[in-house]
């Protein structure tokens, strides 16, 4: 196994330079446990833990090693003296800068970020063409994927379970705009070849989707063997049972790397800026640019192009509602981590409240 086959390139080589002369090895995180990581390197597989210094100096849990990360690891003396075939053990001293990162707000914690996958070139957003099919969820996944700076590809799985798979694909294409859409059946193998443009040697692809979308079945198909266990299909729910319980980096026979992730029961926004939401809803962004006032809130202002488009039917109200929801969530998440934005929001509502009180006093004088 070579570094280039693991996705190593000039970007990571440059970041590793400070460690090159200190007996460190570059390695990639393939599996993350609570207290240790399994790393892949040119020397083979390494089981490693973070040094106390790294744990102490790292500001947040999200900055510690995650699946897909490149790290600087130093082998322990017993591993340096061991011969071939002996398990290697080391210590992780640093996490190299991430080129991309797919994150979400940690479940049950409004102020914590959870890293799902890093250094990903392409994100396969897997959704099933069964009861899992949800256009609004796809919009949410697209916004988060675009914020990660990886290329999103919408994968519509279980085409054999939908009476009009091509019709469903057309619906998705209307909301994805520039993102590619691939329709396939991982169970039967139909359409798998359409994923080939993104599964090139050294490329890293992450599979993300809700529980039961068929990600494990798709990985088994790509691997050409039954490696990921899959749960039996619940005919009552028409939904596969979620079976992946951890994130893992796997090498495909053709040389690509794939990161499997557990099914996402929720995907709260984190680190998603306004541009990622706007890119997901380009028709809304284009209309907003035509409003009379640059700070138009698209509520009651005169000359609002968005309200006009909603009134005449040229803007889909379900798209607008989805845009508003994601925009509010994005703004809320930004305020949670930026005290300046939080203070500005408090000041804005203070002015609104003071204005309402002033109007009430004026109106009261005339009663």
From Swiss-Prot:
<comment type="function">
    <text>One of several proteins that assist in the late maturation steps of the functional core of the 30S ribosomal subunit. Helps release RbfA from mature subunits. May play a role in the assembly of ribosomal proteins into the subunit. Circularly permuted GTPase that catalyzes slow GTP hydrolysis, GTPase activity is stimulated by the 30S ribosomal subunit.</text>
</comment>
<keyword id="KW-0963">Cytoplasm</keyword>
<feature type="binding site">
    <location>
        <begin position="157"/>
        <end position="160"/>
    </location>
    <ligand>
        <name>GTP</name>
    </ligand>
</feature>
<feature type="domain" description="CP-type G">
    <location>
        <begin position="112"/>
        <end position="267"/>
    </location>
</feature>
<feature type="binding site">
    <location>
        <position position="298"/>
    </location>
    <ligand>
        <name>Zn(2+)</name>
    </ligand>
</feature>
<feature type="binding site">
    <location>
        <position position="291"/>
    </location>
    <ligand>
        <name>Zn(2+)</name>
    </ligand>
</feature>
<dbReference type="InterPro" id="IPR027417">
    <property type="entry name" value="P-loop_NTPase"/>
</dbReference>
<dbReference type="GO" id="GO:0046872">
    <property type="term" value="F:metal ion binding"/>
</dbReference>
<dbReference type="InterPro" id="IPR010914">
    <property type="entry name" value="RsgA_GTPase_dom"/>
</dbReference>
<keyword id="KW-0694">RNA-binding</keyword>
<keyword id="KW-0479">Metal-binding</keyword>
<keyword id="KW-0547">Nucleotide-binding</keyword>
<keyword id="KW-0862">Zinc</keyword>
<dbReference type="GO" id="GO:0003924">
    <property type="term" value="F:GTPase activity"/>
</dbReference>
<keyword id="KW-0690">Ribosome biogenesis</keyword>
<keyword id="KW-0378">Hydrolase</keyword>
<comment type="subunit">
    <text>Monomer. Associates with 30S ribosomal subunit, binds 16S rRNA.</text>
</comment>
<dbReference type="GO" id="GO:0005737">
    <property type="term" value="C:cytoplasm"/>
</dbReference>
<dbReference type="InterPro" id="IPR004881">
    <property type="entry name" value="Ribosome_biogen_GTPase_RsgA"/>
</dbReference>
<dbReference type="GO" id="GO:0019843">
    <property type="term" value="F:rRNA binding"/>
</dbReference>
<protein>
    <recommendedName>
        <fullName>Small ribosomal subunit biogenesis GTPase RsgA</fullName>
        <ecNumber>3.6.1.-</ecNumber>
    </recommendedName>
</protein>
<keyword id="KW-0699">rRNA-binding</keyword>
<feature type="binding site">
    <location>
        <begin position="209"/>
        <end position="217"/>
    </location>
    <ligand>
        <name>GTP</name>
    </ligand>
</feature>
<keyword id="KW-0342">GTP-binding</keyword>
<feature type="binding site">
    <location>
        <position position="296"/>
    </location>
    <ligand>
        <name>Zn(2+)</name>
    </ligand>
</feature>
<feature type="binding site">
    <location>
        <position position="304"/>
    </location>
    <ligand>
        <name>Zn(2+)</name>
    </ligand>
</feature>
<dbReference type="GO" id="GO:0005525">
    <property type="term" value="F:GTP binding"/>
</dbReference>
<dbReference type="GO" id="GO:0042274">
    <property type="term" value="P:ribosomal small subunit biogenesis"/>
</dbReference>
<dbReference type="Pfam" id="PF03193">
    <property type="entry name" value="RsgA_GTPase"/>
</dbReference>
<dbReference type="InterPro" id="IPR030378">
    <property type="entry name" value="G_CP_dom"/>
</dbReference>
<comment type="similarity">
    <text>Belongs to the TRAFAC class YlqF/YawG GTPase family. RsgA subfamily.</text>
</comment>
């Amino acid at each position: 196994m070579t570094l280039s086959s693991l996705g190593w390139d000039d970007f990571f080589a440059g970041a590793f330079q400070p460690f090159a002369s200190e007996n460190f090895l570059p390695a990639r995180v393939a599996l993350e446990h609570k207290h240790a990581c399994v790393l892949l390197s040119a020397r083979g597989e390494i089981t490693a833990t973070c040094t106390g210094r790294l744990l102490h100096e790292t500001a947040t849990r999200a900055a510690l090693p995650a699946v897909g990360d490149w790290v600087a690891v130093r082998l322990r003396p017993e591993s340096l003296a061991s011969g071939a075939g002996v398990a290697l053990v080391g210590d992780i001293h640093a996490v190299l800068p991430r080129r991309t990162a797919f994150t979400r707000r940690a479940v049950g914690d409004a102020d914590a970020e959870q890293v799902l996958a890093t250094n990903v070139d392409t994100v396969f957003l897997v959704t099933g063409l069964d009861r899992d099919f949800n256009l609004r969820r796809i919009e949410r996944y697209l916004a988060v994927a675009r914020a990660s700076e990886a290329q999103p590809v919408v994968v519509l799985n279980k085409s054999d379970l939908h009476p009009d798979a091509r019709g469903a694909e057309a619906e998705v294409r209307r909301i994805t705009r520039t993102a590619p859409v691939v329709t396939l059946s991982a169970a039967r193998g139909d359409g798998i070849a359409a994923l080939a443009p993104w599964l090139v040697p050294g490329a890293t692809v992450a599979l993300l989707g809700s529980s039961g979308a068929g990600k494990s079945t798709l990985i088994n198909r790509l691997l050409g063997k039954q490696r990921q266990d899959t749960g039996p299909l619940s005919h009552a729910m028409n939904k596969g049972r979620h079976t992946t319980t951890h994130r893992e980096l796997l090498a495909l026979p053709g040389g690509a790397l794939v990161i499997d992730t557990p099914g996402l029961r929720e995907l709260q926004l984190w680190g998603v800026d306004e541009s990622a939401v706007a890119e997901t809803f380009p028709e809304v962004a284009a209309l907003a640019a035509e409003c009379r006032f640059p700070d138009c809130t698209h509520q009651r202002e005169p000359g609002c192009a968005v309200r006009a488009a909603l009134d005449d039917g040229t803007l889909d109200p379900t798209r607008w509602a989805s845009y508003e929801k994601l925009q509010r969530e994005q703004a809320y998440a930004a305020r949670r981590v930026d005290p300046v934005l939080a203070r500005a929001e408090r000041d804005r509502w203070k002015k609104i409240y003071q204005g309402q009180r002033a109007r009430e006093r004026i109106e009261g004088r005339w009663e």
